[in-house]
Regions:
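N-terminal targeting peptides and non-cytosolic leader segments immediately upstream
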Residues: 1-83
């Protein structure tokens, strides 16, 4: 269904874009997050937004598209769920 979850709670369900389905985009988002969660769930850095892209440290997590939440909404949601 393309839902990316953090600690069992929905983080994002990416919208489909012309070049990729929402499910495909969710695999990329999950892969970008895996870098942090493979180390465990403690001390995950906060997300921030640069030029409309959600980052954790220097890792781009997601570039929102039409139909997605805004980058700031996603960063805020991530920061609530990351703990």
């Amino acid at each position: 269904d393309g839902v990316v979850k953090i600690h069992g709670k929905e983080f994002v369900t990416p919208a489909s874009i012309s070049s990729m389905s929402g499910a495909e985009r969710s695999y990329f988002v999950a892969g970008n997050l895996a870098r942090y969660y493979k180390r465990g769930t403690r001390n995950i850095p906060e997300a921030h937004v640069v030029n409309g892209i959600v980052y954790v440290e220097d890792q781009a997590i997601m570039t929102p598209a039409e139909g997605d939440l805004s980058a700031q909404e996603l960063a805020d949601r991530f920061n609530k769920l990351r703990k």
